[in-house]
Amino acid sequence: MEFGQHFEKVYMIEKPNISDEKIIVALNKNYSIQASEIEFLPIGNDASAFAYRVKTKNQVPYFLKIKTGIANLAGLFVPRFLKDNGLEQVIAPLSTKTQELWVNIDEFAFILYPFITGNEAMQVGMTDAQWIKFGSVLRQIHVTELPSDISQNVKPETFVPKWSNIAKELQEQVNTQNFDDLYQKELAIFWKENNETIQTLVERTETIGTDLRQTDLEFVLCHADIHTANILLTQERDMFIVDWDDTLFAPKERDLMFVLAGDSIHTREEQMFFDGYGNVKINQLALAYYRYEWCVQEIGDFGKRVFLTKDSGESTKQHSLEGFIELFSQGDVIETALNTPFESEIRNHS
């Protein structure tokens, strides 16, 4: 199974606190777009981002992402650079009238993209040819050298798991407090039932991270969230890679973990991918780190939405609870991580 496959579910979110009228005015002022239709899309797995489909009077569609701030400028500059330098499979932000890749409106950041009509590869699957193409495109990304004015905005991997402290805070809260909220109460019960597993995930992530900070590793340009829910396929079989928000410099295993099977048996899709990507040496310790870190991130993120985020609505809490529980399902990311060897080993993949 592809690592991260629980993303097949979409976690609904509420609309941001900004009117449609204000959005339309902002698009006209900053992008010279006269929107005639605007539709909120309750999709995505990012609690700080909101999606809209916008249509102009000429029926030209756009995809508008509204964020509560931009934490990683590389997520804008890198796809724009890749697109401008011939990587057609990249969806990049469009420029404003002043040639910026975003515009600040009140407490929000507006980012406008072309609207691609298609389906997530995770939902519809990919052909052998598309898996090969995916491998080839990711290899191109990994060997890309960025100019200094862009690379200075790309953060390097630190191997310090940023969600670890939040997971610990939540674990302390769950084990010491009582809850009246229905979703908090249900998640607290489930969390306590899985206390030992969660503790193991956090401890192993931190331990492996410490080891990797003392290891000489090659860093490449990584998308960092390149599961197949972030690959769009059109009816014409074109492929587009979206959601570059987590872009960073890191070992290639950061991206390859989404493709490598959870066991030693190579799936057909995995083999097709590497037919396109080419021969590669896999650092087993780095692969283990990213699988464990991903689990801790999901535990912290879903848990935070239920316990810590004050403006989480009922829908967000419900879907976050479901997402949290699903992490522990057979064959999902936690089982895959726990079955990943975490000794220092390099293995060839071809």
Give each language-model segment a name.
Residues 110-124, 172-184, 296-314:
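A glycine-centered beta->alpha junction motif in the catalytic cores
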Residues 33-56:
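ATP-binding glycine-rich phosphate-binding loop
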